[in-house]
Design a protein with these regions (language model features):
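Low-complexity, intrinsically disordered or signal/transmembrane-proximal segments
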Residues: 3, 19, 32, 43-44
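Short, positively charged and aromatic/hydrophobic N-terminal segments
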Residues: 7, 20-23, 29
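Residue-level detector of intrinsically disordered terminal segments
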Residues: 14, 36, 49-50
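Bacterial N-terminal signal peptides that target proteins for export
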Residues: 38-48
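C-terminal motif of bacterial Sec signal peptides marking the signal peptidase cleavage site
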Residues: 57-60
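A compositional/structural signature for long, glycine/proline-rich flexible linkers
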Residues: 62-515
């Protein structure tokens, strides 16, 4: 029996305070306690009690300690710094997704094209233009529809109409992983119904619905509907107007669309989630991250990584205290936050796909698994990126000779007839120009990109030349993309690409300087 108690006490080391007492109650019943005076059980109870007390005091229940320093008092300064970096890299996507959620839902009723209460639809009714400054490198090809879901109370039902054009719903969990990507062209009948459930959902999903089980309570849906230009907007609006959200219980009882009101907190009136997170103190950052992990639990494959982070009290429900890093805490934090791109880029380089003047982020983008440094880099540089099976976004900063693109020169982007940016059905492509500030270039033509939907002219051999310059190209007006008289870059978006493009098995168009 003593051997069993030793094992029992040892098992307590991996349990929190409340689970310890639950375990004791499970082992020793009330009747056993009543009979303890008549048997030697009292000796065993005393032994177990002492072991229990020693465990609580000795380990400090490290995961719920009032003094987190106990969890790290055996670490060297170098080990603490390494664990802090790993903790920041691990939690950063979760925190950026949370900041985006807090900002986008920080309204009582839907406002504009970017904000609505949780579980309500947000429609972008116009295409991006040179005045669009909410996000960098704005997309000029599609109109967005978004929902910030909170699945903690009930499942959410999303209704989408069948379409005959590209209309894809990217579904992100709270860690920025894409967990599903339903397309409306696949819908049979007039509508498709999708039931989103959180990790603690206990009900039943109706048989006529596609079940999307989220590992986290917070979910971000970004739905893109391709638009052929200003004259096509009424058609896009008609598609958006057929979309609905319902809470599952309401759908099953009254059938009422969800119209719940939200709340407003002035603390969340920041414009850029990344700036909000990057200026957050260490204690506040990890306190919030630890809290979020309770309702947005880490993946099972993260267990080994989290076991290490637990040594500085980073993990679900843990109590973080920056004082364990001593007088160097502030400097450590400043260096980490300031240099996060420089820290994550070398550890992600193997995933960057170079191709002539171009390069793009490849697999496992949006399906990161345990590639935490890559996940953090994308969260900062391209939050809500798609998997390569959905879209790729090659970027070019230089011409074929490796010189920076600048509007004071003339360029030709040449696409061979037998090297077309092929897509699967309903896919599309575009070449969009951005200034050094990552925004669209304001020009008299209001032309921000060249797309497969435009009326450009091919060469006699079937190839296509796109001309880029600051000065107007009167010789090729339909194929001309205006540029600033300064540095710029190009992004070649390809949605629903064929496999050879998604896997970088084709030759990207050459960008030749003409002067």
């Amino acid at each position: 029996m003593i051997y069993g108690l030793n094992n029992f006490a040892k098992s307590l080391e991996d349990m929190d305070f409340f689970h310890i007492f639950a375990a004791v109650k499970k082992i020793f019943t009330i009747n056993q306690i009543k009979n303890c005076m008549k048997t030697k059980l009292i000796h065993y109870l005393a032994t177990a009690a002492m072991m229990l007390l020693a465990t609580i005091i000795g380990t400090g229940c490290a995961s719920y300690s009032d003094n987190p320093a106990n969890a790290s008092n055996k670490l060297t300064d170098a080990e603490k710094a390494e664990l802090l970096e790993r903790a920041y890299v691990y939690a950063l996507p979760l925190m950026l997704m949370d900041a985006t959620y807090l900002h986008m839902t920080n309204v009582v009723e839907p406002v504009g094209q970017q904000q609505a209460p949780p579980n309500r639809l947000i429609h972008a009714r116009v295409l991006a233009n040179a005045n669009t400054k909410e996000v960098v490198t704005p997309n000029v090809d599609t109109n967005y529809t978004q929902v910030m879901m909170d699945l903690s109370g009930d499942a959410l039902v999303l209704r989408l109409p069948h379409t005959d054009r590209f209309c894809l719903a990217q579904i992100l969990d709270a860690w920025s992983n894409c967990i599903a990507a339903p397309v409306t062209t696949d819908i049979e009948g007039d509508y498709g119904y999708y039931c989103f459930t959180g990790p603690n959902f206990k009900g039943e999903v109706p048989a006529n619905m596609t079940h999307i089980a989220s590992p986290t309570d917070h979910v971000w849906m970004l739905l893109r509907t391709v638009c052929k230009g200003k004259d096509d907007l009424p058609n896009v609006h008609a598609i958006q107007d057929e979309m609905r959200t319902y809470m599952l219980n309401d759908y099953l009882t009254t059938g009422a669309e969800y119209t719940g009101k939200g709340t407003h907190n002035p603390d969340y009136d920041f414009k850029a989630p990344v700036d909000y997170i990057m200026t957050m103190p260490m204690d506040k950052f990890f306190a919030r991250a630890n809290e979020l992990m309770l309702t947005n639990p880490p993946a099972k494959e993260d267990a080994k990584w989290l076991a290490d982070l637990k040594r500085i009290n980073v993990g679900p429900g843990l109590k973080f205290d920056a004082s364990i890093f001593g007088s160097e805490a502030e400097q450590l934090w400043t260096n980490l936050v300031t240099n996060i791109i420089a820290i994550t880029t070398p550890r992600s380089q193997q995933f960057v796909k170079p191709n002539g003047s171009w390069q793009f982020y490849g697999e496992p983008i949006a399906e990161f698994g345990t590639e935490y440094y890559y996940r953090a880099l994308i969260a900062v540089a391209a939050l809500a990126a798609n998997p390569v099976s959905v879209a790729v976004y090659p970027r070019a900063n230089v011409d074929s000779e490796g010189k920076h693109l600048n509007g004071n020169h003339r360029y030709c982007l040449h696409i061979d007839a037998d090297n077309w940016p092929d897509t699967n059905p309903f896919g599309f492509w575009s070449v969009t120009l951005y200034g050094e500030d990552n925004f669209l270039y304001d020009n008299e033509q209001n032309r921000y990109n060249i797309t497969d939907r435009d009326n450009w002219k091919r060469n006699d051999d079937g190839s296509l030349d796109i001309y880029v310059s600051h000065e107007a190209d009167t010789e090729h007006p339909d194929n001309w993309l205006p540029a600033p008289a300064d540095d710029f870059h190009l992004i070649f978006r390809i949605y629903n690409p064929v496999a050879r493009i998604a896997h970088n098995e084709w030759t990207m168009p050459i960008i030749t300087r003409l002067d």
